């Protein structure tokens, strides 16, 4: 490490120690709550997708993850000459449980790369930004691919971090099975095409909304489709893989720029499993 790099690196570590009110960061310490919240915010900001989802910090390792929903109407009328007005509780409690497991983010950056960054005035921002970005990407990868939690993980056998923790899709499979469509005419798979269960992916998304989502939420303007980029390409590739007059090409470009499935906005998310679709808000 060059002397200039060492100077900037030491200054960065001193600043990190000051933020956490410790003498040195070379010793184990608990991250200060305000720093922890700022770090969480920066991890979310490192990813356009993470900015669109809710993330809650909790104090307890385990507990109830209680979701609040509105399931019944409240509009009514009462003849107060004879009866008192009665308030109604419109909420339904969708109670599930969480258990936080320690996840290590052990990071090493070679001196050569630090030397390259040392010439920039925003050295520390680059240094910490790379780590935050990778942590954000790992969170997304686990969220969509995690199926289990191992005492010692194996990156070779599980390159998509399947054994680090149970992800969002796995939690759906285990805790919300009534809203998971996994089979068509054949057990364990759904086919799309002329002879398939659905003629196209739009019909599949329509079924998911009509049959898997409560009626009160079916017209929610925040509903979106999450899928793999390949799934999006499979739908729109026929539009571009042909000779077209300019007018038709323009129409195709407009359609592709406003990617939708069953009129819902589509987001191709990093690390999302192929042959999987999630309709959510």
Regions inferred by a protein language model and the residue ranges of each:
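Short, intrinsically disordered N-terminal pre-domain segments
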Residues: 1-20, 87-88
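Surface-exposed polar/charged interaction patches
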Residues: 15-22, 41-46, 56-59, 171, ...
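Short glycine-rich, low-complexity/disordered patches
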Residues: 22-37, 141-153, 219-223
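Assembly/oligomerization interface modules of large self-assembling protein complexes
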Residues: 26-108, 129, 160-170
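Helix N-cap / beta->alpha transition motif
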Residues: 32, 101-112, 226-231, 281
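Residues at beta-strand starts and edge strands
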Residues: 101-103, 125, 221
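Alpha-helical scaffold segments that mediate packing/assembly in large oligomeric complexes
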Residues: 111-207
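Extended oligomerization regions of viral-like shell subunits
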Residues: 194-281
